[in-house]
Amino acid sequence: IHFLSDKLVEKGYADKRFESLVLNREIVAPTAYGNLFAMPHPIKKEGLENKIAVCSLNKSINWDDKKVRLIFLICLNKDSQESSFDELFDRIVSILDNPEKAEALIKEDNYSKFLNLFFEY
């Protein structure tokens, strides 16, 4: 969360409070969903722009007693429709609920190819 939050702040997509807002959300309800992925996000939409920071790990980490290798840090601005998050969440979950698709995304180390795979599914 720290690494990805820093990237969003560096690029001007979120302010310095973003990381603490995400960590506060994790305290309330961890965002590791099983099948090797997590989708952290703040409780409120506090981003400056709508962005997703993605991190694929070579080795899994423990995240609230679940193994995680693929992280989607969601950054939505306050003007975003709630349905935007719901649609994004549903899309990511539908892809990652399929172990073969999840593994293909985890293994892809080229960002352009990763995006192509993501949108292909």
How would you name each of these model-derived features?
Residues 1-121:
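Cytosolic covalent-transfer regions centered on His/Cys nucleophiles
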